[in-house]
A protein has these predicted regions:
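Bacterial Sec-dependent N-terminal signal peptides
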Residues: 1-27
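GH16 jelly-roll
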Residues: 23-265
């Protein structure tokens, strides 16, 4: 058997194994959740995301107008900034993360969310290594559970690493997929972080598997480590494009976040 055929067989077997893990909910035990039923954000777990220079972070704001607890959901908003003297960003967006506070020790992470569409809107749910000091980006990887652009009826599910970015091995194996969503309703976005693969799913249906493979190239699968979770609304950027302020405000409703671990056999 040739090496290419052997590698293909291994990847296929991993995908089948991962698919079974993703589809069988009985294999998982709920170990933590936040259902956002309180009167405010639980700051023992969450913080507001920091403003930064990257496209995803350059409108992040602690402005209370970007946050609301409503109907058992946390609502993250994107708004027009009407006071450029106090903040030079033309738009302000809400975002939260568990950085430095709460680690997700692999397993299954799911988020139930409803996303409003708007031109230039870019809501995201994603994971980065909890140990930021020893896992500088992209060496520790990035797991994008959900990104949605504008009024799209699909979500992007992606992973990044030193292997895919620096070594440009983003198709060996493929590193992302798109999955259909209910654009005006709640959807459950999830990923299983397993020793041998990442398994993405939407509404309980497996959408994509990224396997660990045998390779002499470094950094192919750094993901099986504790992670922190980011949930943020963003407006504008080179990927999503220009914002139409007439379509604002725009909202991202978070119903719950759940973390599962495999049941012991």
């Amino acid at each position: 058997m040739s090496n290419s055929k052997h590698s293909s067989t291994i990847i296929t077997l991993l995908c089948i194994t991962s698919m079974l893990c993703a589809c069988s909910r009985s294999n998982w035990k709920l170990v933590w959740q936040d259902d956002f039923n309180g009167s405010g954000i639980d700051y023992t777990v969450w913080s507001h995301t920091d403003r930064g220079n990257a496209d995803w972070a350059n409108t992040q704001s602690k402005d209370p107008r970007c946050y609301e607890m409503r109907g058992g959901c946390l609502v993250l908003k994107g708004i027009v900034n009407d006071n450029l003297e106090s903040d030079t960003a033309h738009y302000l967006t809400g975002g939260i993360w568990t950085k430095g506070k709460h680690a997700f020790d692999c397993g299954r992470i799911e988020v139930r969310a409803r996303l409003q569409g708007a031109k230039g809107a870019w809501p995201a749910i994603w994971l980065l290594p909890f140990d930021t000091e020893n896992n500088r980006w992209p060496n520790g990887g990035e797991i994008d559970i959900m990104e949605r652009l504008n009024h799209d009826t699909i979500a992007y599910q992606t992973m990044h690493s030193y292997y895919t970015l620096n070594l440009k091995q983003d198709n060996n194996p493929p590193h992302y997929t798109t999955a259909p969503i209910k654009p005006n309703d709640f959807n459950v976005y999830g990923v299983d972080i397993l020793p041998d693969s990442l398994v993405f799913h939407v509404n309980g249906k497996r959408t994509f598997t990224y396997p660990r493979i045998n390779t002499d190239k470094p950094g192919q699968f750094p993901f099986y480590i504790p992670q922190y979770l980011l949930i943020d609304m963003q407006l504008g950027g080179s990927w999503v494009g220009a914002v139409d302020p007439s379509q604002l405000p725009v909202e991202m409703e978070i119903d719950w976040v759940k973390h599962y671990q495999p049941r012991k056999k």
